[in-house]
Amino acid sequence: MAIRPVYRPTIVKKRTKKFIRHQSDRYSKLKRNWRKPKGIDNRVRRRFKGQYLMPNIGYGSNKKTRHMLPTGFRKVLVHNVKELEVLMMQNRKFCAEIAHGGSSKKRKSIVERAQQLSIRVTYASARLRSQENE
């Protein structure tokens, strides 16, 4: 049976569109990633009507749902089986995410131990070889 979170609130984002960099649509050398405009005459910095919006604190998510996955869990990065034991009592609030640097052998042991402790693992099947391929 799948582990369910204690409660699963509706996650409301105040803004889902990305904030894009001023004039990134005009010049290909300017990437779309947000950079704060610093120019003395810049229209975006001066918040003129019809210009791109700048990110600010008002766009922040609700404190209760911040960093929450759509499943209702929060992620905790796990490097080995010992770090997984910390989540044993909190398995209805947090789920484990296996760190990128772990080998497939270590990943396999973490997934097995998580199943014993009934801890959910995000993307548990990644980099696990099936029996046919071995």
UniProtKB/Swiss-Prot annotation:
The keyword Ribonucleoprotein applies. Keywords: Ribonucleoprotein, Ribosomal protein. It comes from the Eukaryota. The keyword Ribosomal protein applies. PANTHER family: 60S RIBOSOMAL PROTEIN L32 AND DNA-DIRECTED RNA POLYMERASE II, SUBUNIT N, RIBOSOMAL PROTEIN L32. It holds the Pfam family Ribosomal_L32e. Belongs to the eukaryotic ribosomal protein eL32 family. One of its GO terms (biological process) is translation. This is Large ribosomal subunit protein eL32. GO terms for cellular component: cytosolic large ribosomal subunit. One of its GO terms (molecular function) is structural constituent of ribosome. PROSITE patterns: RIBOSOMAL_L32E. InterPro entries: Ribosomal_eL32, Ribosomal_eL32_CS, Ribosomal_eL32_sf.
